[in-house]
Amino acid sequence: MRELTLYQVDAFASEVFTGNPAAVCPLEDWLPDRVLQGIASENNLAETAFFVAKDDGFHIRWFTPESEINLCGHATLASAFILFEKLDWGQEIVTFESKSGHLSVRLGDDVLILDFPSQPGTLCETPKALVEGLGCEPSEVLACEDYMAVFEREEDIVHLNPNLDALTQLDLRGVIATAKGKDVDFVSRFFAPKVGINEDPVTGSAHCMLTPYWAEKLDKAQLKARQLSKRTGELGCELKGERVFISGKAVLYLEGKIWI
């Protein structure tokens, strides 16, 4: 049997039991996809990140309990946290190659800063399954890798009680529900039952779509965001050209061994 080290990190959090938990599994070389998927399913967290050293950085992949995905912000933040805090990465920036291209994470002042691609959405017709799934009609809907449903008030986001069966009928990965915030610039929630995530606690990748939208609406490049899941999470977002910089903290919850 092969022994692997496994970490669990609460990302976009300053204390345990908040933010978004992610499993991180460093590898010396790639295991078969069925094994990676098996580990992620056994972990049963929203995402498990795996990375392998490549040149002067790393190749990273992310799996939900159901499938591999193209981009995951909080598990990337968690992976960088492990490299900086546990694996003695001696530089201020760690770079990752992924299915979504080149990503990097930089040590900031008491935070980690993700450098991700901006993913602006395109206005689209409101899918029937989206309205059935959210239980109400948004003021507008945009599409990219996910649908983004925009509402008028923060309370609209708080009170959503989604029909998950209806949301699984959508053709895209999931639904970001968002509105202007009261004491932050914008708030959101994220639902992706199609890939095994009923509600994600804090979704870094969703802010690649949220940030360009709200930067234009509010006419500001630096934004404060809050995800209104039960665990909640705080993010700093900045739009610079075609890149989005997402900042947050992380804390270690678990370190252990698995045998496969």
Name each region found by the language model:
Residues 1-71, 77-260:
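Active-site proximal loop and beta-alpha junction motif in alpha/beta enzyme cores
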